Amino acid sequence: MTGEKIRSLRRDHKPSKEDGDVLEPCEEEATAALGGAFTGGRSGPGGSGKGGKACHKIFSHHHRLQLKAPAVPGPGVPAPPQHNAVTATCPAPACLGGSNPALVADGGGCPSLYPVHECVFKGDVRRLSSLIRTHNIGQKDNHGNTPLHLAVMLGNKECAHLLLAHNAPVKVKNAQGWSPLAEAISYGDRQMITALLRKLKQQSRESVGEKRPRLLKALKELGDFYLELHWDFQSWVPLLSRILPSDACKIYKQGINIRLDTTLIDFTDMKCQRGDLSFIFNGDAAPSESFVVLDNEQKVYQRIHHEESEMETEEEVDILMSSDIYSATLSTKSISFTRAQTGWLFREDKTERVGNFLADFYLVNGLVLESRKRREHLSEEDILRNKAIMESLSKGGSLAEQSFEPVRRQSLTPPPQNTITWEEYISAENGKAPHLGRELVCKESKKTFKATVAMSQEFPLGIESLLNVLEVIAPFKHFNKLREFVQMKLPPGFPVKLDIPVFPTITATVTFQEFRCDEFDGSIFAIPEDYKEDPSRFPDL
């Protein structure tokens, strides 16, 4: 392993699970979950050893593979169908291979609805190359799989590469919450994992570029302001409670420029890394120069770029192939809000001031963190090594102490040839699809998340405006979690104080303490003249 930096990836759908997105950390084994959670800068103020960064990456890369909360439809609004615009019709139950009411209800098991899926399943590359021009290759079948999912799970590499060449979505997840990249890791073909990883990064860059004009327009229409919020992290794991940080963040917004000042660089080596950090977004600059992070203590800066070297990609593939496949989803399917009560004898709705704003407090009910962990692609040696690392961390050790050097991983022996027919697969009951690919070794867990949220009608900023600001500073992962949580259907008002699950064993209380309309000196959005560029100061940004 070279001294090249390794950066973590980022990553939807309910897991029955590379966002969402879904992220992903969620494991009742506290230390394992936290390993996935702690991402960020170097292991020390001046840098880090390559072994520490590599080991750290094991537990952070799953962010590309999801924690995205599914959108909560309004009352009486059905969830949108996943079928694509194929003109074929399904005449009668005969087409469904029976009278399964679940299939009849959504047309799910009708083979004629999924011609692209069928030719991928059967490995018919010639027909696929014809259909691909006129059909939606991102369509999900009744099991939530896209054609790319099937191509990867069945090892149909020619079909997979053809789909990728036509920009088939990589981040999308099936009904079990797994992305094509996750399935590729399970199958174990290194070339396919690399191709999917590169396409995922390309699509992420394109998505950012597509959103940029809308985001700049929204920022321009939003007034200038100063916003201060406080983060307080907690955990139900005793050892972690002592090391979790708190942070006061200051956000300055002027025109289409944003500056975020924070003292929390990130979680690293099972310890919080503190510093004096500023994140600057300059909407007037070229996209490649819009994002800058300043280390105000060392007086250096780094531009946030999205390109990675060939070596970095290969190293990341090594780590993907030697780590658990992780999925976590924040399920809001049964979420509800009830007014919090106060008083001993005479109960009344709780209303208090949060900072300068009067707020109504609500209890958040039915919020469930669902997680899955797969390791069918790992050898016994891999599992023992990863377990030893986590045990060391749980006893207070650091990643830097682990002399971890991931070796170049070779492709695994393919799983046994698929014996399931297309008709058997597509007519299977929803949620009970026959398994394709390597035999699963999967552990599942669910954790009910208890939270409160304080909503204020007095706060000057609207939720939509907040979402636009948070979208800009999404490279900071805990802010991205805040954005995902706020996207839920909340009670009336603005969430001036709320609890959010940052990771399976870690929650954060976020408090919006101050807001004021203001104007600032333009110099605060510029790189100071005495700062020097350090392209590798923040390897995970």
UniProtKB/Swiss-Prot annotation:
Q: Where is the composition biased (Acidic residues)?
A: 21-30
Which SUPFAM superfamilies does the record associate with it? Ankyrin repeat
**What Gene3D superfamilies does the record tag this protein with?**
Ankyrin repeat-containing domain
Give an example GO cellular component term for this record.
endoplasmic reticulum membrane
Pfam families named among the record's database cross-references:
Ank_2, ANKRD13_C
Q: Where in the cell is it found?
A: Endoplasmic reticulum membrane
Q: Manganese: is it a keyword of this entry?
A: no
PROSITE patterns listed in its UniProt record:
ANK_REP_REGION (PS50297), ANK_REPEAT (PS50088)
Principal place of residence:
endoplasmic reticulum
Look up the record and give one Gene Ontology term from the biological process aspect.
protein retention in ER lumen
Source organism's superkingdom?
Eukaryota
State where composition is biased (Basic and acidic residues): 1-20
Physiological role: Acts as a molecular chaperone for G protein-coupled receptors, regulating their biogenesis and exit from the ER.
- Which protein are we looking at? Ankyrin repeat domain-containing protein 13C
Name the species this protein comes from: Mus musculus
